[in-house]
Amino acid sequence: MRRNSIHKQGLYLGSVPERAAVANGATPLTLDHDLDVLPGAGRRLTVAELAGHVEDLAGRISAAGVKAGEHVVVHKAANFDVWLLATAVARTGAVPVMLSHTLDGPTLAALMERLDKPHLLTDGPKLEALAGLPLAELTRSVISVGGSAPGVVSLAELAGSPGVRPRLQGLDEPAMITHTSGTTGIPKLVVHTPRTMRARLRPQLVLLALMRKRETVAIHIAFGHSRMFAAMALCLTKGMPVLLVNRGAPEDVAEFFLKHRPGLIEALPNSFLAWENLADDPRKPFASVKYFSSTFDAIHPRTVRRLLGASARRAQFFQIYGQSEVGPAVGRPYYRWSAHRMDGRCVGYPLPGSARVRLVSQNGKRPSAQNPGLIDARWDGIAKTYHGEQERYDANVHDGWWRTGDVGYRSKFGCLHMLDREIDMIPGVGSSLEIEDLVLDKLEELVELVVVLGPDSRGVPIVCTHGDEPLDLGRWRTAVAAYPQLADPIQIPLAELPRTATMKTRRVELSRRLEEKLLRQG
């Protein structure tokens, strides 16, 4: 068996573009933005050109002093070159560490301390933003995608460096590090290996095999997210044309999709939520879409119905539930004819070749809607460890099962219902996520609704409206009449909602801000 087979043995990120170029070199990739690291490359590439750019950048990174086995933090502005640089780092045999551009300075410093002097690969604006950090103490070297500066190595000045052949780790050695969302504090550093990353492709390969024709795939995911690397590996391997979306504003997305007409869109739930109103756009930007795919978090039923209705094809909406440490765990499709019956808490059934899932009682009684159990997962796709926090990782492992931190139950038909994060449960409220689904269904003017724990232990609805228009309190009271346990709503501008790099609402942070606001008023 070939050690670098990405399906049967392991997913080796640094060799994916080169291998794909051999089989599908002419397949196009189209971007809605320019690459920071290669501004002259243009917005339309072939897979063969992509592979050449990865080899070129790997040579430059090696010339900058990066060695196999070392950590290289990739922390720069959102751009497809984040994926490109990480893949080039992996080709050198070093370990790319994907730290989101949304992380603040203190958090970034804390994570780099945990990594013990990594290289930092960044850009000019980020270097200016990090001016207050002791980078000389925190890092082995600082490498910039742009111009040079004192103490900074410029990749631009290393153009023409000799290329490097892919250097492959062992199947169970660290190959990439990403981080958790950090909704409860400093993020954890999640270690992925070639074996765990390869395992996560299995269920998705089965789903892709069901597609009758090769579709153009539009991807709008944080470029440093673990899901992005899986999605790109699948698209490149299968020779599927790719549209890479960085500009996520609805009007920008509409224009890009109208021009290039994707057949499959992969995006995060809150991105689809932000695009909902495009369903009513007379230009019909979703008309060509056969498949919508949303991963990791549950998606609101209203969003699914509206997007399916916006397609001119017999569209399907695939919801896949999982997390950074687990990968895809369960999933299910929705269709236009069945979406009106969608229960937003039913996140899916076991996927072929994917994780096993169990429910663990919290009190000795059978898990149910009224008595949710702890959701555990088990398979070979679970991340290897938390870098620098093995004890914290081990605390989540119970008899070989990974404790996800979510609570839920199984229906009589076997569908896993995810009701809440354990840490976000509010006494006397039931499922906050279920309330959010049902109220969003009734109030189309809401673009986001988050129920968080208030200072008096009541559930406080935080609402955001389209265009930040004032909330109609009469319509609100009618919509929440079945939930007398809720406090009065607090409306904030959507831009003030604290989010992670993957657009998750940071509920703990939102609750903290709410408490501070009420204390100031009180």
PLM region spans:
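Gly/Ser/Thr-rich phosphate-binding loop
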Residues: 263-266, 278-342
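Conserved AMP-binding/adenylation subdomain of ANL enzymes
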Residues: 198-216, 224-264, 278
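Conserved AMP-binding/adenylate-forming
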Residues: 41, 58-103, 219-222
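Conserved pre-ATP/AMP-binding loop-to-beta segment of ANL
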Residues: 10, 25-29, 160-179, 185-186, ...
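Conserved AMP-binding A3 loop
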Residues: 44-48, 175-202
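N-lobe entry segment of adenylate-forming
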Residues: 1-64, 473-477, 511-522
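AMP-binding/adenylate-forming catalytic core of the ANL superfamily
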Residues: 265, 379, 384-385, 405-485, ...
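Conserved ATP/PPi-binding loop(s) of AMP-dependent carboxylate-activating enzymes
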Residues: 349-354, 363-395, 415, 430
